[in-house]
């Protein structure tokens, strides 16, 4: 249903945000 689609979208958005934050932290910790 619609609610499950919303939950899936929220889960995907949260994962993407977490990956983005992790990437920024990794860049800060490991200057190239």
From Swiss-Prot:
One annotated GO biological process: defense response to bacterium
**GO terms for cellular component:** extracellular region
Principal subcellular localization: secreted
Q: Does the keyword Secreted apply?
A: yes
Question: Where does this protein have coiled-coil stretches?
Answer: none
Instruction: Provide the free-text tissue specificity comment from this protein's UniProt record.
Output: Expressed by the skin glands.
* Protein name per UniProt: Dermaseptin-L1
């Amino acid at each position: 249903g619609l609610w499950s689609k919303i939950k899936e979208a929220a889960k995907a958005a949260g994962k993407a945000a977490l990956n983005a934050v992790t990437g920024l932290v990794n860049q800060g910790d490991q200057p190239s």
